[in-house]
Curated annotation (Swiss-Prot):
This is UPF0754 membrane protein SH1116. It is found in: Cell membrane. Pfam families: DUF445. Belongs to the UPF0754 family. It is a multi-pass membrane protein. Keywords: Cell membrane, Membrane, Transmembrane, Transmembrane helix. It comes from the Bacteria. GO terms for cellular component: plasma membrane. The keyword Nucleus does not apply. The lineage of its organism: Bacteria, Bacillati, Bacillota, Bacilli, Bacillales. It comes from Staphylococcus haemolyticus (strain JCSC1435).
Length: 378
């Protein structure tokens, strides 16, 4: 009986120790939230693991999401899936179906989008000839006038103000290009071509420096050159001189008469093509062309859907760069309260954490059992 009590006691003690140890270990993942000090010395294991490593965790989660979960290829694949295409197409059709409303007319659409045009006057007075004549007369009157005198003063002022930023923008873009991997490769390729053309003379230089080191040196000096004050002065002066030269040129030198005529005719033709007769301006579209809406929904809707997907795919890389998904995830996680993070992890891994605690009790009890047996025989 005594031996049984000893074993039972050791099992209970071992189970309590094992279980409590695992409970404390799990608690130490989250707590304490801040470090504690005794005599200016930080107490070990404060703060807890997750509070201490929260920024690293946020960085890694953001990296995993950007590089493995929500990647450009994944989004491209999703965009081109039949379900996505169908959803976009349904939305486009839904918007186009509004044309079926009884009061939807061309004039109302024009007014809705603030087209400040007297459609009746334009149609009745032969818009094409009127506009072409006015444009041609304007060109003949202004062909000897400089661009500086033709453009409005506020436009000239705006361009003058923005012009000072052009040099800085050019130098910045040049710096970005030279600092990029492509810039480095291009410099190396040009040096490689240069060495191949110069032959043995340049070969002597390679006895002291490798092509890679020469390319790095050239890259460094070019980048440094873009930051040199004199480079800024030269670039700004060239831009300013070219701009002043352009402003002083007469209109006929900048745009030739034949070019102006072609542009005018194309523009007027485009305007006329998109206008209708007066009686059709106030006729509901559903009555004007009963089959038009259905044709639009079938043909144009598919075209618009393809265009949306194509444009989204072509600009996806730029969009992803602008969004900066990794940084967005990091910032969001870092704004979470530690209490919320603790609740979130516990909700996700509640079952597993309970199993870990139970395993601690079980292993502790097993160890206590064997310790009890050893204690009896010893």
């Amino acid at each position: 009986m005594q031996a049984f009590l000893v074993i039972l006691f050791m099992v209970v003690v071992g189970a309590v120790i094992g279980g409590v140890t695992n409970v404390i270990a799990i608690r130490m993942l989250f707590h304490p939230f801040k470090p504690y000090y005794i005599f200016k010395m930080r107490i070990p294991f404060t703060p807890g693991l997750i509070p201490k490593r929260r920024e690293e965790i946020a960085t890694k989660i953001g990296q995993v999401i950007e590089e493995h979960l929500i990647t450009e290829s994944v989004i491209l694949q999703k965009l081109n899936e039949p379900n996505t295409r169908e959803a976009i197409n349904d939305l486009v059709i839904k918007q186009l179906s509004k044309l079926k409303s009884d009061d939807a007319t061309i004039r109302k659409f024009a007014n809705q989008f603030d087209f400040d045009l007297d459609l009746d006057d334009l149609i009745n007075n032969k818009l094409d000839k009127t506009i072409i004549n006015k444009l041609n007369n304007y060109y003949y009157d202004k062909q000897a006038t400089s661009i500086n005198e033709i453009l409005p003063a506020d436009v000239i002022t705006m361009v003058d103000e923005k012009l000072d930023q052009a040099g800085d923008l050019i130098r910045e873009r040049a710096r970005n290009y030279l600092s990029s991997d492509k810039g480095a490769r291009d410099i190396y390729d040009m040096l490689d071509t240069f060495f191949a053309e110069k032959g043995k003379i340049v070969g002597l230089l390679q006895m002291f420096m490798t092509k890679e080191s020469i390319a790095e040196r050239v890259q460094h000096e070019l980048i440094r050159l873009t930051r040199h004050p004199k480079a800024k002065v030269i670039i700004d002066k060239v831009i300013r001189d070219e701009y002043e030269t352009l402003k002083s040129q007469p209109l006929s030198h900048v745009v030739k008469e034949e070019q102006f005529t072609n542009i005018s005719e194309s523009l007027v033709h485009l305007v006329i093509t998109n206008l209708q007769l007066n009686e059709k301006m106030d006729t509901p579209i559903s009555k004007l062309t009963p089959k038009l809406v259905d044709q639009i929904q079938v043909g144009v809707a598919n075209t618009i859907t393809d265009l949306i997907i194509k444009q989204a795919s072509n600009h996806l890389s730029t969009i992803m760069t602008k969004i900066n998904l990794r940084q967005m995830v990091e910032n969001q996680i870092n704004t979470f309260d530690l209490d919320y993070i603790e609740r979130l992890i516990i909700e996700i891994a509640n079952k597993e954490l309970k199993l870990i605690m139970s395993l601690g009790f079980i292993l502790g009890g097993i160890i206590g059992f064997f310790q009890g047996i050893v204690a009896i025989f010893v």
